[in-house]
Amino acid sequence: ETIRDLAFGGVSTEDIIYELEKEGIIRGYKAVIDWDSFDDAYVSAIVELNVVPKADLGFEEVAEKVMSYHEVESVYLMSGSYDLNVVVKGKTLQDVARFVARELATIDSVTSTTTHFVMRRYKEMDVHLCDMEHDDRGQFLL
């Protein structure tokens, strides 16, 4: 059955959610936290990895290795000028830089890394994280 069939068949929302969870379509739930409002906020970075894919395995082996680190929040295979997009978090800029240098950059198939530190989060997982106000001149105040 499709979601539409369930919804139009008079099935409750709870039953639809249960079915989606059972089938593995809903993989989990997560709270969106505005870490910038905490004193003990963490630093996050987007790390671009260039990778030489392995025969018969492609990028999978490297992606699995990268995913195994607790500092890694997300991993995406990309089209374009680099291969893997890795979202990393740490307590400080130095922690993230050290992790990239000691762990990610030393993986066998990784040929280069480029790290971009997140300066501010405006929207995450479709949730607005900051209120943007206009001043009298029509400019944004943050």
List where the protein language model places each region.
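A compositional/biophysical signature of low hydrophobicity enriched in polar/charged and small residues
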Residues: E1-L142
